[in-house]
């Protein structure tokens, strides 16, 4: 079953799903802006198109992840994103 989600006044939209190959996940798009997300469980983020400038928990430096890049976020934490162009992503809940 698909679940639509909308965050930050519609600037981030995702569709949640579950499959045997991916597990529980969501795929979405973010438009330009700065966002802070909280995690309940560990997440694996894959940038599909565009790029994300990311400040991970306990990090002091921002890091750019471009299309095809993957980064992991611990559970029960916050991470910050800067988005300069519309960017699509896949988020797997681990």
Swiss-Prot record:
The enzyme's E.C. designation: 2.4.2.1, 2.4.2.2
InterPro entries documented for this protein: Ppnp, RmlC-like_jellyroll, RmlC_Cupin_sf
Keyword set, alphabetical order: Glycosyltransferase, Transferase
Gene Ontology CC: cytosol
Superkingdom, taxonomy of origin: Bacteria
Gene null: resulting phenotype: Cells lacking this gene show a consistent change in xanthine level.
Enzyme class label: transferase
UniProt keyword Glycosyltransferase present: yes
Catalytic activity: a purine D-ribonucleoside + phosphate = a purine nucleobase + alpha-D-ribose 1-phosphate; adenosine + phosphate = alpha-D-ribose 1-phosphate + adenine; cytidine + phosphate = cytosine + alpha-D-ribose 1-phosphate; guanosine + phosphate = alpha-D-ribose 1-phosphate + guanine
GO molecular function: guanosine phosphorylase activity; protein homodimerization activity; purine-nucleoside phosphorylase activity; pyrimidine-nucleoside phosphorylase activity; thymidine phosphorylase activity; uridine phosphorylase activity
NCBIfam families tied to this protein: PRK10579.1
Described purpose of this protein according to its UniProt entry: Catalyzes the phosphorolysis of diverse nucleosides, yielding D-ribose 1-phosphate and the respective free bases. Can use uridine, adenosine, guanosine, cytidine, thymidine, inosine and xanthosine as substrates. Also catalyzes the reverse reactions. Is not able to produce D-ribose 1-phosphate from D-ribose and phosphate.
HAMAP family attached to this UniProt entry: Nucleos_phosphorylase_PpnP (MF_01537)
Family affiliation: Belongs to the nucleoside phosphorylase PpnP family.
Protein name: Pyrimidine/purine nucleoside phosphorylase
Lineage, top ranks: Bacteria, Pseudomonadati, Pseudomonadota, Gammaproteobacteria, Enterobacterales
